[in-house]
Amino acid sequence: MPHPDGDLDRRIELLTAQIIAARKAYYQENTSLMSDVEYDALEHELKDAEHAKGFSDRNSPSLTVGIAAQLNLFEPVKHIEPMLSLDNVFSLDQLHSWYEKTKKICPEGDQCTFVCELKIDGVGVSLRYANGYLISAATRGDGAIGEDITQNMLYVPSIPPRIALPGIFEIRGEAFIKRDEFDRINQLSLERSKQFANPRNFVSGCIRTKTPNMRYLESISFYAHGFTQVYGYTSGGMNLHSDITASGGVKTEIEHGMFSAYSRLSECKIPVNSYNRLCTNFSEIESYIENIRLNRQCVPYAIDGIVVKIDSLQKQALLGSTTKAPRWAVAYKFPSESTVTRLLDIEVSVGRTGRVTPYAVLQPIQLDGSEVSRATLHNQKVIGDKDLLIGDYVRIRKAGDIVPEVLCALPEKRDGSEVLFKMPSLCPSCGAELMPSKLGDIDLRCPNMQSCLVQLAGRLEYIGSRGVLDIAYLAEENAYALSHLRKFGKSAEVQLFKITIDDLVALEFMYKGNMRSPFRKKGDSFPGFEEPTKSAQDMVDSIERAKRSPLWKFLLALNIRHIGPASAKALADHFGSIESIINAKIDELLKVRSLGETIAISVHDWFRDPWRVELVNTWRSDGALFGD
């Protein structure tokens, strides 16, 4: 049944907000809000909805890539040509359809060749060389403007600071870490409260930081997968016929093809993947994919598919690109792999909004190149629907090759010792009685938002994140420590803008004293100095800067349930001040574009709690401007 226009508009706005939030988390906060499969499904649904509407905004996620660079942290770098994404296909039939359509660019009787490459699960990087010297390295950003990460990328051993090619080139490629290197670093990080979640997030965090860790950066690798030049061919072309022996290179006459260009780049010491293959028909492409699929675990780094490109640079130029992706390339995504392990226990965690989420404690097992020992189970209904008992053998997979997921139980392996799981009735953190937020809700929540220390620590961590108030070093460990500091404790959130250097010196994570840290192994300690660290000063400076954040970011910082970046911006634009939002009635909130009844009620009810109004008033009196 077709959507009424109003419903379709609201659905498009919701999908847009979800996709932008996921991109921001992925590209700026080095984390994942959802699996690749879930994200791809959102993008496909948005395209379908816009098609049904007969219109798409030029800034729609369906027509754009990445997310705007964080120019408050990094200098901007304008790419010579847009650094685009790739369209995805999820079956060989879809890939064959793309192949047949793309092959039509080739004249009758002219062989059309394709390059097959591994789709490495890393971070896209653009390297700019001028007359042989590396002058900048940048992230993808929004495809047009990226973030300057040159100083960090200079530590990556496989990136040459000088190459034997004249002129100005941008080399596009993937920064990644090999599995054994990632495992080695995680072994060296046992003193941390938690290890790095996955290789991709590790790489993103390493190259997108103002405080680089040389040891970590030296573990990162790079492979080139594209290039462009200020002059000569565009859309992936550079004049590789040039006689460059004067620059120390080897004179090589080649056709203007991607595969032969890779060979030329390799001669110039630019790393190129040895798994790249030239294919002359679809049967060869299919064989390549099957061979990689069967031997995927032999590849020393994480991959999630195969990229297929037309080889001819001239034909690439003829096919061109959309605003989001080239028409001459596509990514075939592998189905998620699965394996069997034991469900040892089911435990629960408490989130920043009070939601209590069960998760599976698994017999540790290797899956797709990394050890898996935990997987979310969402809620009691999911556990029941999947017929899970503690002690079961279960089949698991990585959804989107990242997030561990329990698919089902294997009841035929039961021996009678299995135990039924029941959600706890009390909060494991504060002891409050758990309950649904409203009649009919599946999720249980801890209603003690003001005093539950786990919720408080989660809110502080969220407040400090890059997408909210961007407070340096206010991450998980530090948020936990603040919420347990005797001076603040349960009022740490309210007193956030009162924090001083002296307060941070009292925290072990900011103090170079000989106190044992709760986040380190027994017996570990800090060196014996008694002055605040640079980290402490950076954090205090960040708190001061955060006072001048725009109103919509403060709305996020208040941790109002259901409020994301899109709805926060809509509220800020509509009302203009925090006081107007506090005093707004539900019918006034419903007039805000893209706000439905659920969000309107959530915002209205949030400001009816006296302690939350006190939070706003205290922040205001402590210098927070709320966008004024």
From Swiss-Prot:
Keywords: DNA damage, DNA repair, DNA replication, Ligase, Magnesium, Manganese, Metal-binding, NAD, Zinc. NAD(+) binds at residues 36-40, 85-86, 117, 140, 174, 309, 333. It catalyses: NAD(+) + (deoxyribonucleotide)n-3'-hydroxyl + 5'-phospho-(deoxyribonucleotide)m = (deoxyribonucleotide)n+m + AMP + beta-nicotinamide D-nucleotide. The keyword Nucleus does not apply. It comes from the Bacteria. Its cofactor is Mg(2+); Mn(2+). DNA ligase that catalyzes the formation of phosphodiester linkages between 5'-phosphoryl and 3'-hydroxyl groups in double-stranded DNA using NAD as a coenzyme and as the energy source for the reaction. It is essential for DNA replication and repair of damaged DNA. GO terms for cellular component: cytosol. Zn(2+) binds at residues 427, 430, 446, 452. This is DNA ligase. Belongs to the NAD-dependent DNA ligase family. LigA subfamily. GO terms for biological process: DNA repair; DNA replication. SMART domains: LIGANc. It is an enzyme of class 6 (ligase). It comes from Tropheryma whipplei (strain TW08/27). It holds the Pfam family DNA_ligase_aden. The active site is at 119 (n6-amp-lysine intermediate). Gene3D superfamilies: 5' to 3' exonuclease, C-terminal subdomain, 6.20.10.30, DNA ligase/mRNA capping enzyme, Helix hairpin bin, Nucleic acid-binding proteins. GO terms for molecular function: DNA ligase (NAD+) activity; metal ion binding. Its EC number is 6.5.1.2. InterPro entries: DisA/LigA_HHH (IPR041663), DNA_ligase (IPR001679), DNA_ligase_AS (IPR018239), DNA_ligase_CS (IPR033136), DNAligase_adenylation (IPR013839), DNAligase_N (IPR013840), NA-bd_OB-fold (IPR012340), NAD_DNA_ligase_OB (IPR004150).
